[in-house]
């Protein structure tokens, strides 16, 4: 289902953004 694929990709991107924000807070 393309909708589920989009959701997983979106959640992956959101997780990536949160990780980058976390790394920026460490630096």
UniProtKB/Swiss-Prot annotation:
| Record's GO cellular component terms | extracellular space
Top-level lineage group: Eukaryota
Query: Pfam families in the record, alphabetically?
Result: Hormone_2 (PF00123)
Which residues are recorded as modified (Methionine amide)? 27
Its localization reads: Secreted
Which molecular-function annotations from GO does this UniProt entry contain?
digestive hormone activity; hormone activity
Query: Which GO BP terms apply?
Result: adenylate cyclase-activating G protein-coupled receptor signaling pathway; diet induced thermogenesis; hippocampus development; intracellular water homeostasis; positive regulation of lipid catabolic process; regulation of appetite; regulation of synaptic plasticity; response to nutrient levels
InterPro entries found in the cross-reference section? Glucagon_GIP_secretin_VIP (IPR000532)
- Keyword vocabulary terms for this entry: Amidation, Hormone, Secreted
* Function noted in UniProt: Hormone involved in different processes, such as regulation of the pH of the duodenal content, food intake and water homeostasis. Exerts its biological effects by binding to secretin receptor (SCTR), a G-protein coupled receptor expressed in the basolateral domain of several cells.
Q: Which family does it belong to?
A: Belongs to the glucagon family.
Name listed for the protein in its UniProt record: Secretin
Q: Which organism is it from?
A: Gallus gallus (Chicken)
